[in-house]
């Protein structure tokens, strides 16, 4: 977040994750994906084609970083892209209009692939539900998993993440802000009231 984002965080805030913590966490999630999806044995019978799709905005950046780490650690190129959920949200009439983001699906599409949705914060689960609806219009994956940097609880839908960087118990009056250098000039996670 830039200066405006910093001002929106408010006076009562504390750092949950430093830049180094964010880097280590993304690295750990990448290793977990490699192990859980059998990417470390890409010719094995259970090794699926894996596609990472980020939910805009910061989920896309996280998907890009995860894909880079997975390639670095395993030598396997993982397709990655973005999945715009704007028109699938259930709060379109409640919240102010937002610009459409773009959906970019890697070559080969998502049919029969293991799609891992990537987001920065898992809260109510409504963004993930919107992503599942959007995904249905893009193709038919073999399976769908979810990776998040922060899980703050307070689910309103029966969803859970397969890969979680950090579980952070919060109150509903608190906000979790993920900062990524590509958008905010630095990495970090802050909680505020």
From Swiss-Prot:
Alphabetical UniProt keywords: Glycosyltransferase, Transcription, Transcription regulation, Transferase
InterPro entries: PRibTrfase_dom, PRTase-like, PyrR, PyrR_bifunctional
Pfam families per record: Pribosyltran
Gene3D superfamilies xrefs: 3.40.50.2020
Gene Ontology MF: a single term: uracil phosphoribosyltransferase activity
Positions occupied by motif PRPP-binding: 115-127
Primary enzyme class: transferase
Biological-process GO terms, alphabetical: regulation of DNA-templated transcription
Entry keyword Transcription: yes
Binding site for substrate: 57-58, 98, 119-127, 152, 176
EC number of this enzyme: 2.4.2.9
Highest taxon, organism lineage: Bacteria
Catalysed reactions, semicolon-separated: UMP + diphosphate = 5-phospho-alpha-D-ribose 1-diphosphate + uracil
GO-annotated cellular components: peptidoglycan-based cell wall
Family, as annotated: Belongs to the purine/pyrimidine phosphoribosyltransferase family. PyrR subfamily.
Function: Regulates the transcription of the pyrimidine nucleotide (pyr) operon in response to exogenous pyrimidines. Also displays a weak uracil phosphoribosyltransferase activity which is not physiologically significant.
Name the UniProt record assigns to this protein: Bifunctional protein PyrR
Organism: Mycobacterium tuberculosis (strain ATCC 25618 / H37Rv)
Lineage of the species this protein comes from: Bacteria, Bacillati, Actinomycetota, Actinomycetes, Mycobacteriales
This protein's encoding gene: pyrR
